[in-house]
Design a protein with these regions (language model features):
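A short, Lys/Arg-rich alpha-helix, primarily the initiator
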Residues: 1-23, 29
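DNA major-groove recognition helix of helix-turn-helix/homeodomain DNA-binding modules
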Residues: 57-74
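Short alpha-helical elements of helix-turn-helix
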Residues: 12, 28, 44, 58-61
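Short, charged recognition helix plus adjacent turn
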Residues: 1-5, 48, 66, 76-80
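DNA major-groove recognition helix of helix-turn-helix
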Residues: 34, 50, 60, 79
């Protein structure tokens, strides 16, 4: 399929935060957490975000941070 242009910079960290959570959070569970915040992103789209194939809005960025209990700066790779 070749190289696909990355459409976001948070995908890798979303995956890391989701998998390293205790207990681990599935893409389906993350989708439910986002929906509670009014952000409708399905589990298949979360997979695309994690792979860098789908763009993320600022509202979605904030919702991901809240749902995963991490900072926006961490998701953006600005803080360690």
């Amino acid at each position: 399929m070749g190289n696909v242009e990355k459409r976001n910079i948070i995908g890798d960290r979303v995956r890391v935060a989701r998998i390293s959570a205790n207990p681990k959070v599935t893409q389906l569970e993350l989708s439910a957490r986002l929906q509670i915040q009014g952000v409708m992103i399905g589990d298949s789209t979360i997979g695309k975000i994690e792979n860098g194939a789908s763009a993320v809005t600022d509202i979605q960025l904030l919702a991901f941070a809240k749902a995963l209990n991490v900072s926006v700066l961490w998701l953006l790779g600005i803080e360690g």
